[in-house]
Amino acid sequence: MPAGEIRARGVELEAKAALTANINMTASYTYTDAEYTKDTNLKGNTPEQVPEHMASLWGDYTFNQGPLSGLTLGTGGRFIGSSYGDPANSFKVGSAAVMDAVIKYDLARFGMAGSSIAVNVNNLLDREYVASCFQTYGCFWGAERQVVATATFRF
């Protein structure tokens, strides 16, 4: 179904801070004002799957000395605001918040500068939530807890 024309305006903000030599914080926020502007039936409605608000907050602690030097522990949360489930705006998909975590080890102390190994856990608490819907007949669950291991090597 052709959607006509959609206008989207908004703002994205991000702040990063090194609170100490060991602690880093990152925060972000997105505001989106989207609507159908040229459509006989949908003019003024918000497009489906477009949340008005999204935000995240992340913090990590890196050990710089001692036997744990090079180890980073981090955690944070993501918020996805509610959105409409269909172009007619007849129902909303609820908002959701999930937590993530990481354990990372920098291999520089072993003569491998720029190399690291990490384990990331997305949706740490294994929260069940509806991520999006396609009209009134198809909604999709958000991703379950995922554990991802990575290794980065620079030569």
Give the role of each language-model region.
Residues 1-2, 136:
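Generic anion/oxyanion-binding catalytic loop in active/binding sites
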Residues 2-84:
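Gram-negative outer-membrane beta-barrel transporters
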Residues 48-155:
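Conserved C-terminal beta-signal and adjacent last beta-strands/turns
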